[in-house]
């Protein structure tokens, strides 16, 4: 990967008087980030849901389009006959809410600079002054939209999957692809970029046409599947709109770990600690991640934090995901039953068609959603569950927790079900097997740690969800005259 000379700035060795000028000029010089940048890579594992996909799969840093085959993938007499993938959108801009918080923080730094001229007690320029001068290039119109890096995420994922499963992604099967997407533009644009990646696979060297001009046509929008949480009244009332549902998130913000960071950042930026809060600290940390993910530059915002700070801020993010999308409340995962059942309906149909020696009508189903789509589903299936809940008070005990959102659902994260037909099976049960991949790596079964399952056994394990979990009932609010167990 190319790197501009002097791209990596070390504020500790740069002449203090020239620090601000150096930081400003670096933006123009650093268009790509060295994969092993020591400062950026030291914080990268802790960005939570704002994590780059390649930081979860470091092999992609050197060859993002080269297929990587997990040695646990089945081969030989077992042939993949269907692939069902749930894919999070690619890298995106911050939301308008995050942009406005960053603008607020930037304004605090500029106001401080206008009072004291940006000089420290030694008369030199400090980090706060340099950040005040750092270009704030985020604008409200960006509001969570997919960036070019996000389109690249999708094109490259398409190329890798097509190379990994050539029979399923054959040119003959192109017209039988099924694409479903959330109505959010970042998901629709991700699906379009994925299709362009497939075009590149089929027609190397030729520029892809617009998706509307492809023989496949645009994907189907289905928010009841991809944004099931928006259609679950119980979730909306008891979690989304409940001021106390994220108690542990708010308690951690005022706890000792976050308060220590608050004081440290206030001292570093030379602003009154009362002018800062946990939300502003978090948006500063995320700005480091956005600059890295979107532009590939090492932002001076990264210099505000060290690894210990990053671990605390990651936990704050994980607390929110845990209580709002994971194991915190049962309805978080149960609201995804319809999506889980839909996946198995596709697999059932493929099994039935194969048993009848019919062609598989939908060999590849691609569904584009959000981190909020994937996390509840993985929780429903029993993945990444810790022995104790994540709370505001057990940060140190959870240092080695399983539930780390950045490792589970980075940008472009994907959960893939692969159905195999095995020719030399001794019994009908052994004919069909399933493997799951998370972020292109084989995901051991949550209940056995095996890397492959007979399809019938997998269905039996999840029988309760497949047969008894009815979203209409799960999401129905208790009637007003019924007994409530709320405190």
Curated annotation (Swiss-Prot):
List, in alphabetical order, the GO biological process terms annotated in this UniProt record. bone mineralization; inositol phosphate metabolic process; intracellular monoatomic cation homeostasis; ossification
**Tissue expression as described in the entry:** Widely expressed with highest levels in kidney, liver, cerebellum and placenta.
The cross-references to CDD domains, in alphabetical order and at most eight, read:
HP_HAP_like (cd07061)
Provide the record's note on post-translational modification. Answer: N-glycosylated.
Q: Which SUPFAM superfamilies match?
A: Phosphoglycerate mutase-like (SSF53254)
Kindly list the GO CC terms recorded for this protein: endoplasmic reticulum lumen; extracellular exosome; extracellular space; plasma membrane
Q: Which residues carry a glycan?
A: 242, 481
Q: Keywords for this entry?
A: Cell membrane, Disease variant, Endoplasmic reticulum, Glycoprotein, Hydrolase, Membrane, Secreted, Signal
Q: Where is this motif: Prevents secretion from ER?
A: 484-487
Question: Key word Secreted present in the record?
Answer: yes
Provide an example Pfam family for this protein: His_Phos_2
Task: Name its cellular compartments.
Answer: Endoplasmic reticulum lumen; Secreted; Cell membrane
EC numbers on record? 3.1.3.62, 3.1.3.80
Q: Does the keyword Hydrolase apply?
A: yes
Q: What catalytic activity is recorded?
A: 1D-myo-inositol hexakisphosphate + H2O = 1D-myo-inositol 1,2,4,5,6-pentakisphosphate + phosphate; 1D-myo-inositol 1,2,4,5,6-pentakisphosphate + H2O = 1D-myo-inositol 1,2,5,6-tetrakisphosphate + phosphate; 1D-myo-inositol 1,2,5,6-tetrakisphosphate + H2O = 1D-myo-inositol 1,2,6-trisphosphate + phosphate; 1D-myo-inositol 1,2,6-trisphosphate + H2O = 1D-myo-inositol 1,2-bisphosphate + phosphate
Q: Where is the signal peptide?
A: 1-30
Q: What class of enzyme is it?
A: hydrolase
MF terms in GO: 3-phytase activity; 4-phytase activity; acid phosphatase activity; bisphosphoglycerate 3-phosphatase activity; inositol bisphosphate phosphatase activity; inositol hexakisphosphate 2-phosphatase activity; inositol pentakisphosphate phosphatase activity; inositol phosphate phosphatase activity
Catalytic center residues: 89
The protein's job, in short, is: Multiple inositol polyphosphate phosphatase that hydrolyzes 1D-myo-inositol 1,3,4,5,6-pentakisphosphate (InsP5[2OH]) and 1D-myo-inositol hexakisphosphate (InsP6) to a range of less phosphorylated inositol phosphates. This regulates the availability of these various small molecule second messengers and metal chelators which control many aspects of cell physiology. Has a weak in vitro activity towards 1D-myo-inositol 1,4,5-trisphosphate which is unlikely to be physiologically relevant.
Known disease link: Thyroid cancer, non-medullary, 2: A form of non-medullary thyroid cancer (NMTC), a cancer characterized by tumors originating from the thyroid follicular cells. NMTCs represent approximately 95% of all cases of thyroid cancer and are classified into papillary, follicular, Hurthle cell, and anaplastic neoplasms. Pontocerebellar hypoplasia 16: A form of pontocerebellar hypoplasia, a disorder characterized by structural defects of the pons and cerebellum, evident upon brain imaging. PCH16 is an autosomal recessive, severe form characterized by hypotonia and severe global developmental delay apparent from early infancy. Other features may include stereotypic movements, spasticity, and progressive microcephaly.
The record ties this protein, via PANTHER family, to: MULTIPLE INOSITOL POLYPHOSPHATE PHOSPHATASE 1, MULTIPLE INOSITOL POLYPHOSPHATE PHOSPHATASE-RELATED
| Entry's family note | Belongs to the histidine acid phosphatase family. MINPP1 subfamily.
Tell me the protein's name: Multiple inositol polyphosphate phosphatase 1
Species assigned in the record: Homo sapiens
Q: What is the lineage of its organism?
A: Eukaryota, Metazoa, Chordata, Craniata, Vertebrata
